[in-house]
Structure formats: structure tokens, C-alpha cells
């Protein structure tokens, strides 16, 4: 009944992944991001992650697998997803939604920490404001974006960009894979002397 649609969706996902894999810049960006994060952890820093909608879920998933576990048991790593509902609703109400992440970064971000901002379009105003707040704190910035990087293009120390111009779900599929690889590489870096 839906076999053709299912195959079409899976083929499009596979094609998007293949294009991402075949661009060496993407592989290099993931490696640089993992080393940047591990270096921050080794120096006593933390990562603060944020996103909207599905990207918000990815930011939470990233933090959870760093503080909890990925595949193997190991010490937890310092990671916070900006997801506290009371903070989000307070700042949205009192300042506006575009400040929900930047206010948090202003409050808890420190020099040596890393901000991970996730936006499939690269145009999320509240992520852009969080990047500005992170820069003001002396933090490093990693972004996961899509399409042409949007307004966030060029704003990060490391940008992992999925150059897909269709629906956001294809970009999110690559983002979650990149997140899992980041965690795997961070774990390898953390056991180095």
C-alpha cells in the first residue's frame, strides 16, 4: 500500500546522508567540534545546548547522553540543555521568546564553556542572541545548521551544516547522527592523557 512512499523516503534520507558524508569539510567539522568540547571539559568547562522544536529535543538528547551515558558506562560530562520550563516561560513572558537562551547563557555561561546552538534553518533569532551572549562571556560556539547556514553562517568556531534545502526532518536526521558521533569522539578524547 505505501511501499513506494516508504522506499522513497528512505532513499531520500540515504541520499542526504551520502552527500553529507562525501564532503570532507563535514567530517573535519565534527572532529574539530568533538576536540573543542573535550578540551573544554578537561579544563573544567561545560557545554550549554539549545534549540527550538525538534532541535530543542536534540539539544536535550545531547546533554542527557553526556551527563548520563551513550553506549558504555563512564563518568558523566558537564552538559546543560536550556530546557527548564519555568525559565523559558518567565523569560518569554517578561523579555520575549528571542531572549530565552541568551538570558540563560548570561546567567551560567563562563569563559572556557561551549555553546551548542542547533537550528535547521540557521535563522533562529533566539539562537543568534545566545551566540552573541556566549561570545560576550568568552565562550566557544558550535552550531548545527542546515541549508546555507542562514544568518548563523560564519558565527561559530565550528559549524556543522547539512546542505539540504528540503524539509527540516532530513536535516534533523543528520544532526542526531552528528550528535551521536560527537559523543563517541568526546568519550575517546576524554580517556587520553
Curated annotation (Swiss-Prot):
GO BP terms, alphabetized: carbohydrate metabolic process; D-glycero-D-manno-heptose 7-phosphate biosynthetic process
Q: Which family does it belong to?
A: Belongs to the SIS family. GmhA subfamily.
UniProt GO MF annotations = carbohydrate derivative binding; D-sedoheptulose 7-phosphate isomerase activity; zinc ion binding
Question: Could you tell me what the cofactor note in this record states?
Answer: Binds 1 zinc ion per subunit.
Q: List the disulfide bonds.
A: none
Question: Which residues are noted in the entry as Zn(2+)-binding?
Answer: 61, 65, 172, 180
| Positions with a binding annotation for substrate | 52-54, 65, 93-94, 119-121, 124, 172
User: Pathway of this protein?
Assistant: Carbohydrate biosynthesis; D-glycero-D-manno-heptose 7-phosphate biosynthesis; D-glycero-alpha-D-manno-heptose 7-phosphate and D-glycero-beta-D-manno-heptose 7-phosphate from sedoheptulose 7-phosphate: step 1/1
Additional notes on this entry: The reaction produces a racemic mixture of D-glycero-alpha-D-manno-heptose 7-phosphate and D-glycero-beta-D-manno-heptose 7-phosphate.
Name of the protein in question: Phosphoheptose isomerase
Q: According to its UniProt entry, what is the function of this protein?
A: Catalyzes the isomerization of sedoheptulose 7-phosphate in D-glycero-D-manno-heptose 7-phosphate.
SUPFAM superfamilies cross-referenced by the UniProt entry: SIS domain (SSF53697)
What cofactor does this chain's UniProt record say it requires? Zn(2+)
Task: Pinpoint the SIS domain residues.
Answer: 37-193
Q: Which reaction does it catalyse?
A: 2 D-sedoheptulose 7-phosphate = D-glycero-alpha-D-manno-heptose 7-phosphate + D-glycero-beta-D-manno-heptose 7-phosphate
Q: Which NCBIfam families does the protein's record reference?
A: gmhA (TIGR00441), PRK00414.1 (NF001628)
Q: Which PROSITE patterns match?
A: SIS (PS51464)
User: Which keywords label this protein?
Assistant: Carbohydrate metabolism, Cytoplasm, Isomerase, Metal-binding, Zinc
Q: Encoded by which gene?
A: gmhA
Q: Where in the cell is it found?
A: Cytoplasm
Write out the GO cellular component annotations: cytoplasm
Q: Source taxonomy lineage?
A: Bacteria, Pseudomonadati, Pseudomonadota, Gammaproteobacteria, Enterobacterales
Q: Which HAMAP family match?
A: GmhA
